[in-house]
C-alpha cells in the first residue's frame, strides 16, 4: 500500500534526539547521510536535535575519563553527562568522530552511551551530499530564528514571540515555565 509514496523523496527528513548515534565512526555517519540524501526530496528539509558537541566538550574539558557534570534538583539527580573519551582536541574533521559520552536522564534512569556531534564537521559532510543550511530569511519564514542553532536561541525566540503576541502564552505555557535546570539540559 505504501510503495512509491515518496518515490521522489520526503519533503522533510527528521532525526530527533538520535543524531549522536551516527557519530560513532565515519562509516556510520556516511551511511546515515547517504540515506538522508536518497530519501529527502531535492529542495526538502532535514531537521535534527542533539546536544551541541562543542558545548559538551567544553563542559567536560577539565574532567578525566569517567568524570562528569550532574544537575541535582531537590536532592534528585535529573541529568548527568560523563566523559568517556581520551582525546584532547575536538577538530572540525573526521577525527571528531567516536567521542563517547554517557548521558543520564531522569526519565530513563540509567546512563546511555552517546557520541559528541560536531556541527561544523556535520555541516561540511552534509554539503558534500547536496544539503545546505537554510539562510536566515528562509528560516524566519518557517518560524525559526536561524537555519541552525542552539536550544537557547529557540527559547529566546519563543519568549520574544509571546511578548509580542500574548495569545501565544496559553499555547506555550509549559515551555515558558521551564526552570533553569530544564533549560540547561
Q: What are these regions, as identified by a protein language model?
A:
Residues 95-185:
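Rossmann-like AdoMet/SAM-dependent catalytic core
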Residues 14:
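A conserved beta-strand element that flanks and buttresses the S-adenosyl-L-methionine
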Residues 21-23, 54-58, 142-147:
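Short catalytic/ligand-binding loop motif for oxyanion handling, primarily in non-cytosolic enzymes
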Residues 17:
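Cell-envelope and extracellular/periplasmic
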Residues 3-7, 20, 27-43:
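A short glycine-rich, Lys/Arg-flanked "PGG" loop and its adjoining helix->strand segment in the class I
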Residues 11:
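Conserved acidic residues
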Residues 47-49, 53-129, 134-136:
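SAM-dependent methyltransferase
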Residues 1-4, 62:
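Class I S-adenosyl-L-methionine-dependent methyltransferase module
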